[in-house]
Design a protein with these regions (language model features):
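Active-site neighborhoods and metal-handling regions in enzymes and metal-associated proteins
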Residues: 2-9, 13-509
């Protein structure tokens, strides 16, 4: 297999995108929900030194001066904490003391001493901007007071541990870096938690008890509950309600990751030819993402040729592509923990067959109409799914793929069997973002959702004409809800038939 020729590939991509990947650089991002208060900004500063994560001093090519993480200030993280504390106290009881415990993720290992790439707990990161494992955010709001205290438990500096695993921030710098009231070693948390809970009553302990981010912390919290007089409540519903509506800084971060993902899918198209493997196409996508500024993929990609595309979560990606195949890719990338999620389908030969073109344009028409509906009606995502089933059934019937002698309800049911997955989910720090926010509420400004209709016809599906069998097609874009028409964040990823045919196979791998 020949080495990927990036120089010739650039000219291919330039024809179909707003900007060239080779010239792409991270933008310096806005970070405020509203005009900043100069007096509040003066309270914050990023200390100089080598810490447990990049800073604007050590990585100015990634983080603008004054920001804690890419595009987001200390002030914004603090405002998020203030909002959460206020929401929780109002929801339960203002006359009780409220204790909030949000643990960071801990390192995970695939085998002895071999770690997985660390991925921070999204809720913890959203509130702190801290990227260190096994830390703990502790907040306490005394009864009948407007103030609250924030304590961050982190690993203390340790020269031996840092020799092996890299720098730690330590307690001394953590207070300033993360703009918290106090920082303590994680080893103190057990005794601190027991003392705090046992000395307070009545107290509401806010902690996510299901699928804990850190089992060690989970055990401490559970044991402290037995000793004290606390009632247990889950903060995650309130956190997800906050997270589902993106700040201006988050919108910019999502634009970046969606742009990178879009260009990487374009490049995967350009490298597709009969005879190469699904794995090779997957590798081109991942390589382009990383070279363009993403840390890694958002999830294991689906790269499914031919009838394998009828298996919705096919991730083996180990078969060779045939000339007559359609290729479905469902992939995304992660940049500063924010995710893109894109699906495209194209002919391996670079030319749609007549029957493949009918199916593809049918799915594309459904997707375009659903995006229009998001702007016109702002429906709940569950209602958008109902629209998809109705439109898909109607269009399939018009093309003669489904019979004309069935009523509307049966038609919707047949469409659902051909596309059994939901048409949309929220997107952000997690691919399936804010899962506790129901999909039956209307969408609002600054939500980001996917729109991903598909059709999957197995090779042995005798209910459709033979020429349409053994094909899976999905088209997915990431969409920002605005006052006007929804903004498609993945609009540089080609999806029109003519554009696809112009780009597929134009680069050797």
């Amino acid at each position: 297999m020949n080495r990927l020729n990036l120089f010739s590939l650039r000219s291919v991509i330039d024809q179909f995108s707003v900007k060239s990947i080779s010239r792409w650089k991270p933008r310096r991002l806005s970070s405020f929900r509203h005009p900043p208060d100069p007096e509040r900004i003066q309270q914050f500063s990023i200390p100089k030194g080598i810490f447990g994560q990049p800073t604007c001093h050590t990585h100015p090519h990634l983080i603008s001066h004054g920001n804690l993480t890419c595009g987001v200030t200390q002030l914004e993280y603090k405002e998020r904490r203030e909002t959460l504390v206020s929401k929780l106290a109002e929801a339960e009881n203002l006359h009780k003391t409220h204790v909030i415990v949000i643990p960071a993720a801990r390192k995970q290992y695939m085998s002895d001493k071999i770690p997985y790439v660390f991925r921070q707990n999204s809720d913890f990161f959203y509130l702190t901007g801290c990227l260190e494992p096994s830390a703990i955010l502790f907040m306490i709001k005394p009864a009948d007071r407007d103030t609250y205290k924030t304590i961050l438990f982190v690993h203390e500096k340790d020269s031996h541990a840092e020799l092996w695993e890299g720098p730690r921030t330590g307690c001394s710098a953590a207070t300033t870096l993360y703009s918290v009231d106090e920082a303590q070693p994680v080893e103190n948390f057990n005794n601190f938690m027991h003392r705090t809970i046992s000395s307070l009553k009545p107290v509401v302990l806010w902690y996510h008890n299901e699928s804990p981010a850190n089992p060690d912390i989970h055990d401490v919290v559970r044991s402290s509950l037995k000793q004290g007089h606390a009632s247990l409540e889950d903060p995650q519903k309130f956190l997800h309600q906050m997270r589902v509506v993106k700040s201006p800084a988050e919108v910019e971060l999502m634009k970046e990751t969606c742009y990178i993902g879009s260009q990487s899918v374009n490049m995967a198209m350009a490298c597709t030819k009969p005879g190469i493997s699904e794995h090779a196409v997957s590798s081109v996508f991942e390589y382009t993402c990383r070279m363009s500024g993403a840390e890694h993929g958002a999830f294991p990609p689906v790269v499914a040729g031919g009838p394998r595309a009828t298996h919705i979560h096919y991730v083996a990606n180990n078969q060779l592509l045939q000339k007559e195949d359609m290729l479905l890719i469902d992939a995304g990338c992660q940049r500063w923990l924010y995710n893109s999620d894109i699906s495209r389908t194209w002919p391996v030969s670079g030319k749609f067959s007549a029957h493949h073109k009918i199916l593809y344009e049918l799915v594309l028409a459904v997707q375009k109409r659903l995006i229009e509906l998001l702007g016109e009606q702002r429906p709940p995502l569950d209602q958008l799914f109902d629209h998809m089933c109705r439109l898909l059934g109607l269009y399939l019937q018009q093309e003669g793929i489904l019979p004309k002698n069935i009523d509307a309800n049966e038609l919707i049911g047949r469409a659902y069997r051909l596309c059994p997955h939901h048409v949309s989910h929220y997107l952000g720090l997690d691919v399936h973002d804010s899962p506790l926010v129901r999909r039956r509420i209307p969408v609002t400004n600054n939500m980001i959702v996917t729109v991903e209709p598909g059709i999957y016809i197995s090779p042995d599906d005798s209910s459709v004409p033979p020429e349409f069998r053994g094909v899976g097609i999905r088209i997915e874009d990431d969409v920002l809800i605005t006052d006007g028409h929804p903004l498609i964040l993945t609009d540089t990823c080609v999806k029109e038939v003519n554009d696809i045919e112009a780009i597929v196979g134009k680069q050797n791998v």
